[in-house]
Amino acid sequence: RLENVIYIELLRRCSNNFFDIYYYKETPRSKEVDFVVCNQDRAVELIQVAYDIEAEKTFKRETNSLLSASATLRCDKLTLIAFTQTRNYEAGGKCIHIVSAIEWLLRPMDN
C-alpha cells in the first residue's frame, strides 16, 4: 500500500533529524491524519496519503481531515500525497500541498 511506502520513507528521513511520527485521530468515529511529524512535541507537518483523490467524496474527506487536525494541533504545513497529482489547494485560510508520491519520494526532506 502507498501508506506503507510513505511511512518507511518518513522513518528513514526522520530518524536522523530527531523527528517523531504519529498517527492522529480526534475521536473514535471522526477524522484522522495518517502521519503527524513532530519535533520536540510540536507538530511540524501533517501528512495525509491517498492513492486516488479524483472522487469528490474522497478528496473532501482527506482535505477536511487535514484542515481539522491543523486547527487542533496548530500546524500549518499540510501535505496530501496522492499517486499522480501535484497542485495546491486552498481552503479555510490554509494551503494544502498536494504532491504525487513519486515527486515526494524523490525530493529531499525540508526541515
Language model: regions and residue ranges:
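A cross-kingdom feature that marks ATP-driven nucleic-acid transaction machinery
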Residues: 1-111
